[in-house]
Amino acid sequence: MITISDAAQAHFVKLLADQPEGTHIRVFVISPGTSQAECGVSYCPPDAVESDDIEIEFTGFNAMVDEKSAPFLEDATIDFVTDQLGSQLTLKAPNAKMRKVSGDAPLVERIEYVIQSEINPQLAGHGGNIMLVEITKEGVAVLQFGGGCNGCSQVDITLKDGIEKQLLDMFPGELTGVRDVTDHQHGEHSYA
């Protein structure tokens, strides 16, 4: 469920050494399955452990995950990174905003999952997003751009060199292309 790097495990052991005995960590998601989902890590004293918590054992400590957060922490990774600017704990949870779908789910659900978990987080850096409008009988994913992508001068490059390439690589034989149906209006909201 959650992978914690050796560096992050050592960091947690060091932090927990200053806490009351029996304290572990809690990994959680606030507003799981929504676009506002946020992940966090906190101390979990023994009296804060709930009967339905999932307990994951590591060397020197355990991680507690509440039942509601668990499916949204699938494939999550925690690392402790040191660079020239210092050290920081990173938590990446690709399924926090949308529950992972199975490989045999309908094509529309699998594409929606990729859009929400991989493509939209990249576009969010420019204040943009896309949504799947439909998949045609010919296997074309019809997309609509929003936010900073609407009216952006780079939208064709983003669509063909980025999104289309990624989706065709992920769904060979199921998708034949992508098409943008956005009525692009360049304005102050547009990224470029």
Swiss-Prot record:
GO molecular function ontology, one term from the record: 4 iron, 4 sulfur cluster binding
GO biological process annotation, one example: protein maturation
**Sorted alphabetically, which SUPFAM superfamilies does this protein's record hold?**
Fe-S cluster assembly (FSCA) domain-like, HesB-like domain
Which cofactors are reported in the record for this sequence? [4Fe-4S] cluster
* Matching InterPro entries: Fe/S_biogenesis_protein_NfuA (IPR017726), FeS_biogenesis (IPR000361), FSCA_dom_sf (IPR034904), HesB-like_dom_sf (IPR035903), NIF_FeS_clus_asmbl_NifU_C (IPR001075)
Q: Which residues bind [4Fe-4S] cluster?
A: C149, C152
Q: Name one Pfam family in it.
A: Fe-S_biosyn
Q: Which UniProt keywords apply?
A: 4Fe-4S, Iron, Iron-sulfur, Metal-binding
Q: How is the cofactor bound?
A: Binds 1 [4Fe-4S] cluster per subunit. The cluster is presumably bound at the interface of two monomers.
Describe the protein's quaternary organization and the partners it interacts with: Homodimer.
Member of which family? Answer: Belongs to the NfuA family.
* The protein's role, per its UniProt record: Involved in iron-sulfur cluster biogenesis. Binds a 4Fe-4S cluster, can transfer this cluster to apoproteins, and thereby intervenes in the maturation of Fe/S proteins. Could also act as a scaffold/chaperone for damaged Fe/S proteins.
Protein name (record) = Fe/S biogenesis protein NfuA
